[in-house]
From Swiss-Prot:
Belongs to the CFAP20 family. It is found in: Nucleus; Nucleus, Nucleolus; Cell projection, Cilium; Cytoplasm, Cytoskeleton, Microtubule organizing center, Centrosome, Centriole. Keywords: Cell projection, Cilium, Cytoplasm, Cytoskeleton, Differentiation, Flagellum, Microtubule, Nucleus, Spermatogenesis. This is Cilia- and flagella-associated protein 20. Cilium- and flagellum-specific protein that plays a role in axonemal structure organization and motility. Microtubule inner protein (MIP) part of the dynein-decorated doublet microtubules (DMTs) in cilia axoneme, which is required for motile cilia beating. Involved in the regulation of the size and morphology of cilia. Required for sperm individualization, differentiation of the sperm flagellum and tubulin polyglycylation of axonemal microtubules. GO terms for cellular component: axonemal microtubule; catalytic step 2 spliceosome; centriole; ciliary basal body; cilium; motile cilium; nucleolus; nucleus. Disruption phenotype: Flies are viable and develop until late pupal stages. Display defects in wing posture and inflation, in locomotion and climbing activities and have a reduced lifespan. Males produce immotile sperm and show defects in sperm individualization process within cysts. Display defects of polyglycylation incorporation in sperm axonemal microtubules. GO terms for biological process: cilium assembly; cilium organization; locomotion; mRNA splicing, via spliceosome; positive regulation of cell motility; positive regulation of flagellated sperm motility; protein polyglycylation; regulation of cilium beat frequency involved in ciliary motility. Expressed in spermatocytes and chordotonal organs in sensory neurons of the antenna. InterPro entries: CFA20/CFAP20DC (IPR040441), CFA20_dom (IPR007714). The keyword Manganese does not apply.
Length: 199
């Protein structure tokens, strides 16, 4: 999808305020909903994904299962609200051994498990809005001893609210971020930054 585009700085794949936030995504809903609502904390439109079973309600990008993202930027950043319910997301990457690896982070797991094609890890979310920063290059190296080449697919499951999902070439401080990539809270409460842990 983005393989032949010049990639530097920021590359956004979901913005809840955009005219078509799920333009690049496919959605699956069973016993739940995916809809745009106004979040009271930030007084802004967000995408809400809610389901009784995290595995059956999710959004996935790209929408076409035969296509891949082809994003080479190594940092995945998601601005997500903790709904105090089970939540998981998954990223599929390609490494320099030409092997597809999946990283799955969830808030209901307590240990990291590394298997040949999937690494599952715990994720701790603070209350309210969180900025999840995922260093794909570092995770690929630590889990598999190989080098990250590109991201193929991103899948976000229930239960959460999403403001934005983007990739970046490095981690940026709050001051360096373009205004539309920041999360402005009406009462200026700083957004918690959390990292998924893969040990």
């Amino acid at each position: 999808m983005f393989k032949n585009t010049f990639q530097s700085g920021f590359l956004s794949i979901l913005y809840s305020i955009g005219s078509k936030p799920l333009q690049l995504w496919d959605k699956k809903v069973r016993n739940g909903h995916i809809k745009r609502i106004t979040d009271n904390d930030i007084q802004s439109l967000v995408l809400e994904i809610v389901g009784t079973n995290v595995s059956t309600t999710f959004i996935t990008c790209p929408a076409d299962p035969k296509k891949t993202l082809g994003i080479k930027l190594p940092f995945l950043v998601m601005i997500i609200k903790n709904m105090k319910k089970y939540f998981t997301f998954e990223v599929q990457v390609l490494d320099d051994k030409n092997v597809r690896r999946r990283f799955r982070a969830s808030n209901y797991q307590s240990t990291t498990r590394v298997k040949p094609f999937i690494c599952t890890m715990p994720m701790r979310l603070d209350e309210g809005w969180n900025q999840i920063q995922f260093n794909l290059s570092d995770f690929t190296r630590r889990a598999y001893g190989t080098n990250y080449v590109e991201t193929l697919r991103v899948q976000i499951h229930a239960n959460c609210r999403i403001r934005r999902v983007y990739f970046s070439d490095r981690l940026y401080s709050e001051d360096e971020l373009p205004p539309e990539f920041k999360l402005f809270l009406p009462i200026q409460k700083p957004v918690q930054k959390s990292n998924a842990i893969c040990s």
